[in-house]
Amino acid sequence: MLGRPKLVLASGSPRRLALLNQAGIEPDALRPADVDETPIRGELPRACANRLARAKAEAALQSIQLDDDLRGSYLLAADTVVAVGRRILPKAELTDEASQCLRLLSGRNHRVYTAVCLVTPKEAFRQRLVETRVRFKRLSEEDIAGYVGSGEWRGKAGGYAVQGIAGSFVVKLVGSYTNVVGLPLYETISLLGGEGFPIRHGWLNAG
């Protein structure tokens, strides 16, 4: 679209990019933000997701302010946190971490929080937090070993990717499925449209 304002996605996540593409939105640039995602001691899951999404947006904003082509763009950042009660699970990088996450999730309810932070061309910050409740079946040691062997969990909040093999572990999901994938699509599109970003599809009137 000629004259469409630019959109920068402050993420290197293929899943978040694919979800935006699914909604007919193609970011003009990707600016993954390098922030420390370690939870603060005693930090609650909601607060952690909100803080990290904001931190990613602020870091990416500093980057695009130095780029003549991207300065004044819309900027979208997000962070996903998986928690059992108040316990925040790691974004697993090691097999032991993944195994521990899966044992903790086995047969239990957990919550997935994704905070979305939008920075407008006038550098106003707008934020939404979406919560989804998920219940896993009871996982056998064979289930856990097989999934860990797949490698799908690497870098994923809570040590699993719901859009892959782990989707077969889900007994019940209440709320946004795309939130569990990494970007709550309805809320994200509503946020963009509500701040004046042109949404291509007519199926959503983001007022």
Swiss-Prot record:
The active site is at D79. NCBIfam families: maf, PRK01441.1. Its EC number is 3.6.1.9. Belongs to the Maf family. YhdE subfamily. Its cofactor is a divalent metal cation. Nucleoside triphosphate pyrophosphatase that hydrolyzes dTTP and UTP. May have a dual role in cell division arrest and in preventing the incorporation of modified nucleotides into cellular nucleic acids. This is dTTP/UTP pyrophosphatase. It comes from the Bacteria. It is found in: Cytoplasm.
